[in-house]
């Protein structure tokens, strides 16, 4: 599991168009905000995605690109992007190996049951590829604003 201060791993993962993308393809002037979510088109994930969409111009003003990551297929991502007018890249980790390496896949407790699945997480990575901040087990609603506020407070 990665920690703050670690170098961000740089695998090639397919985007919504099926094109393999790496960190250098996605990073903006100051860095990247990668949010890991369970599933396209579910209520919480839609809330999270549309909040990032609505705040994207503010993230760009701070020099950050926003990218989503889930197990969903490129086809599912395309439908999700189209339905909700999402202007950012969604990556696919079908076998969850990258999410597991990040610590965003594993055992979780929900409604009193223990299961294995996506642990909703966000990673703020600077331009040099170093993880500046990790948010784990986040609530979808309001999370994008919290990340933006934290980045704004940290930017001189």
Protein language model features and the residues they cover:
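Chalcogenol-based redox active-site neighborhoods
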Residues: 1-156
């Amino acid at each position: 599991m990665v920690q703050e201060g670690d170098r961000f791993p740089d695998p090639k993962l397919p985007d919504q168009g099926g094109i393999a993308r790496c960190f250098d393809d996605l990073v903006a002037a100051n860095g990247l905000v990668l949010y890991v979510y369970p599933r396209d088109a579910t209520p919480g994930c839609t809330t999270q995605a549309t909040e990032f969409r609505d705040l994207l111009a503010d993230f760009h003003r701070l020099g950050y690109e926003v990218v989503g990551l889930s197990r969903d297929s490129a086809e599912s991502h395309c439908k999700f992007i189209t339905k909700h007018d999402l202007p950012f890249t969604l990556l696919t980790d079908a076998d969850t190996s990258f999410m597991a390496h990040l610590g965003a896949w594993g055992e979780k407790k929900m409604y009193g049951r223990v299961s294995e699945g996506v642990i909703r997480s966000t990673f703020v990575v600077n331009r040099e590829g170093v993880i500046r901040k990790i948010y784990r087990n986040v609530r979808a609603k309001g999370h994008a604003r919290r990340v933006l506020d934290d980045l704004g407070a940290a930017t001189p």
